[in-house]
Regions:
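Short, highly charged C-terminal tails/helix-capping segments
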Residues: 67, 170-180
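Short beta-edge strand/loop motif at the mouth of beta-sheet-based domains
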Residues: 50-92, 98-101
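A generic structural signal for beta-strand entry/edge sites
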Residues: 26, 101-103, 128-132
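Hydrophobic ligand-binding cavity/cleft-lining segments
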Residues: 4-72
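Beta-strand/loop substructures that line and gate deep hydrophobic ligand-binding cavities in soluble
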Residues: 96, 107-163, 169-171
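Extracytoplasmic/secreted envelope proteins and their assembly/folding machinery
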Residues: 39, 43-52, 77, 92, ...
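Short, surface-exposed coil-to-beta transition loops
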Residues: 28-30, 88-93, 115-121
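Generic structural detector for well-ordered beta-strands
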Residues: 32-36, 81-83, 94, 105-107, ...
Length: 180
């Protein structure tokens, strides 16, 4: 009887490992919104970390969050480091590439509660009625990340935050309340 239980458990574990191994190794979350403002103003808002508090969907989750900025605003190599409560954790963003006023790339590192590194890209396209801001986050999933993806859909987990952030960016830009 014990032998059958052990064999059944081994089969179950092997099936779970096989299922996790077949999960996608990458993820991508993307949202966009047209904002009635110039690409330059919007580029400055997303590439200058000092301005993120005006529109970031996470800025108000921890009023006591400690933030540190390094480097010149909107310059490659500038960083934004935060340490906060359980809702925001600890992490760092580094501006890695810019193509003013149409694109900003950011290395996003989560340090706590778990470590991961992803890329965020803001693409800006001139359209009738304003500028389309496209916010993309993509990354690699290791075995544990693939296992977590069985229970958590990255698009459903992060997508609504991107939608809130873009809506706040739109309100701040169109309402003239973005910091200079």
């Amino acid at each position: 009887m014990l032998k059958k239980i052990v064999v059944a458990l081994l089969v179950l574990v092997a099936a779970l490992v096989a299922l996790v191994a077949t999960r996608p190794a990458k993820f991508r979350v993307e949202r966009s919104l047209v904002i009635e403002e110039s690409p330059r103003l919007l580029f400055d808002a997303v590439s200058d970390f000092h301005r993120w508090d005006a529109w970031s969907p996470w800025a108000k989750l921890d009023p006591a969050m400690k933030t540190t900025f390094t480097g010149a605003p909107s310059a490659v190599g500038s960083t934004y480091h935060w340490v906060g409560n359980d809702k925001v954790g600890e992490g760092r963003m580094t501006l890695t590439e810019i193509h003013p006023p149409l694109q900003a790339k950011i290395k996003l590192e989560f340090l706590k509660p778990w470590k991961s590194t992803n890329e965020c890209v803001f693409d800006l396209y001139v359209e009738s009625g304003g500028t389309r801001v496209v916010w993309i986050m993509s990354g690699e999933l290791d075995f544990m990340g693939k296992a977590m993806s069985l229970f958590m859909d990255m698009d459903k987990a992060i997508g609504p935050d991107f939608e809130r952030g873009l809506a706040k960016l739109k309100a701040a830009a169109e309402g003239g309340t973005l910091p200079p």
